[in-house]
């Protein structure tokens, strides 16, 4: 399970694969295995240990892995210069936040994971589509290559900032709502309060490397950067996916009610 979702210490393959694979494959790998992995984990753990006499405190073990995963992912992301590797470590850190919800046993824990994964799909794919656009149009694969891009692609730069803000969990974005509901599980269940502190600290750490991209786009200059003709498919994909970060912030309650009802009807717990 840990290998599939890129949980520390089974994350070692993720940065190299993300950097070496075509970016379309990387975008797929950043989302699909996590959705499948958490679906299997929920079914396995909640079925195997529900009412079991086995003396295994698996929620505490998951909580420890959660703290390790988000911390290692964020710290290693700080020193990355390649955009795909940075997003790879960012992806690992987000697994840590989802594991946080998984460690709090209950129906709303499952709802929170589904809620987070749904929002993560849009915020992460929009960031990867922007990386794909930059690589194709400007051969820009490192953060320094993005210097001054806001002056050449102002619309896409704005939506990239929106995606990064959502990945960081800043309001008013869907990523903020997703993290609030993840942390809400801890405060309601009154379990692993230390893990909430770790999550908040890691959120602050992530701001640094997300802002490094924003800084390059808006506050650095590259006189040799030439404006390119945009790829219409990527252009509209970035706008559509990224705009959901605001749309779902405004209308998140209906989605939450639907997912909560769906989990209740599934009868896993």
Regions from the PLM with identified roles:
Residues 1-269:
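Alpha-helical transmembrane segments of multi-pass membrane proteins predominantly involved
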